[in-house]
Amino acid sequence: MKSESRPSNQFGCSTVKPDRVRMIFASPINPVLESLMFTGIIEECGEVAALKPVETGAELWVNSTFTGEVALGESVANNGACLTVTEVKDGAMRFDLLHETLRLTNLGDLAPGDPVNLERSLRIGDRLSGHFVQGHVDACAEILAYEPVGQDHQFTVALPNEFAHLVVHKGSICVNGISLTVADLQKDRFTLWIIPHTHEVTSLKAATVGSRVNLEFDMLAKHIARITELSKS
C-alpha cells in the first residue's frame, strides 16, 4: 500500500496547510485562542446611521469605510460588543440587536450621528497589540469624569461592586471596545489615562460625564475567579 508523503520544508519538517492551522487554533486544546476574537485596538470610529426598534429588539445601522471588505455573518465589535453583520448597503452595516443585548450594553443609548468604536475579528497572523477581548460585555458603567490634563485625558469610570474583584491596578480592561490600562483603582471607581491618539481616533472624543460605557473585564481574571468560587463550594 502506497503511503502518502507529507510536504516538508528545507529543514525536513512537515508543513501545515492553512486550514489545518485554523483547526489547531480553534481546537479544544487551545481554549484561549478559540475564544480570542478581538484585541481592543479600534480599527475605525464609525457613525450611527439608524437605530430602529423591532419586535425582537432593534436594528443598528453603522456607517463605515470598510463595508466593501466585510461579508455577511462576519463578526464586528461595536463599542466592544461582538455583533454579526446581517446586511451591507450604501456604505453601512446592519446589526440585529436582541433585547438582552440592549439590556446589557449601551448600544440602546445610541442615536444617529453618534460615534461607534469598530473592530473586526482577528485573522490568524494579526498582531495582538491590546489584550484578549471576546466581545462579551459584562456590564455598563457611568462615566464619572473625562478631563483634559495637559495633552492627555484623565478618564474615571464607576466600578460596579459585583465586578470589583476582577479589576487590578495596572491590569487590562476593555472600555467601549478599547483596550486600556487601569492607572488608579478605588473601591467604587477606576481611572485610566487616555493619550491624544486614542482620544482622537475613538468615540472618547465625544465622551460626556453621566453617559454609559461598556465594560469587559479581563478574561483570565474571570476564569480564575470562577475556579476559585467553585473550589470553595
What is the predicted function of each stretch?
Residues V32-S233:
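Conserved loop->alpha-helix
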Residues R6, R20-R22, R123:
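Basic polycationic patches enriched in arginine
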